[in-house]
Amino acid sequence: MCFWYYFFGILGIIIVLLIIFGYPRKKNVRTSNFEGIDDPAVAKAFERMTNFLPFKLLRRKIISQLKKITPQGTLVDLGCGSGNLIVEIAEKIPTLNLIGLDISSEILEFAKKRAVDKKMEQKMEFKVGNAEEMPFEDNSIDILISSLSLHHWINPVNVFKEIYKVLKPDGTFLIFDFRRDSRKFFYGFITFVTKIIVPKALKKVKEPLGSLLSSYTPEEVLQFCSQASLQDIKITPFLAWMFISGKKR
C-alpha cells in the first residue's frame, strides 16, 4: 500500500511539473507601470500584500544571496517600499549602514513605522528620491539592492548608469524582479491572484499582474546593462523571475 502512495505522489508531482514547465513562455509586448505609489489606499494594500508567504520566502532568498558577498559598509535598498526587506536585513546583518530609498513618500511612512515597531529605527534611514538621480555622492555606496522595483523604472538604462555612478569601486548590486517572458501557467496564476485574492485597492490598479506585464526579459536587461557600460553582469533566471548581479570595475 505504501508503494502506491509513493507512486501516485511522485506521479502527481511529475504531472504538476509538466504542466508548469510544459507551457511555453509568453511573448508579450511590455506595458508601462506607475513609477511610484501616491494613493494611500494602494500603499496600504501593497503593505498588506508584502506579508503574504511568497514575499516572505523571497526576502529570505535575497538575504541568503546577500550573505554570499560578505556584506559590509553602506547598503542602499532602492525602491524599498514599506521596508520589509531592509528591516529584515538589519535584523540578520546588523553591521551594515542601511538606507532605504523610494520615490513614494506614502509608502515610506509604512517603512518608518515598521522600523520603529521592530526597534530598528536607529540602524537605518529613509529618503525620498528618484532612481535616476539618487541623493548620494559618487563612489559612496558599497552595496545596492532592489526588489520588485526594476519594472517601475521608466528609463532603466539611466538607472543602471546611476547605480554605477554611486557605487564604490568593487561595489556590488543585486536586483530581483519578475521576467515578462514567464510561462503561461504563471500568467494564469497571477491573473487569478489579481482578480480574486488581492485587496480591492490593488484590483483597481490591476496588481500584481500589471507588474508582471511591465517587467523586462533577461535579454532586455543585458542590453540595458551594456548600454550603461556595466560589465561582469550575471543574470540568474528562474521560472517567473530573475536575479541580476554585478560589480563596479
Residue ranges and their predicted role:
Residues 25-30, 85, 176-244:
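C-terminal alpha-helical "lid/dimerization" subdomain adjacent to the S-adenosyl-L-methionine
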Residues 154-158, 183:
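Short N-terminal helix/helix-N-cap motif within the alpha/beta-hydrolase-1
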Residues 74, 171-172:
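Short glycine-centered segments of the SAM/dcSAM-binding site in methyltransferase folds
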Residues 132-143:
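A short acidic, Gly/Pro-enriched loop at the edge of an enzyme's catalytic core
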Residues 6-70:
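Conserved class I S-adenosyl-L-methionine
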Residues 76, 82-133:
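Class I SAM-dependent methyltransferase SAM/SAH-binding core
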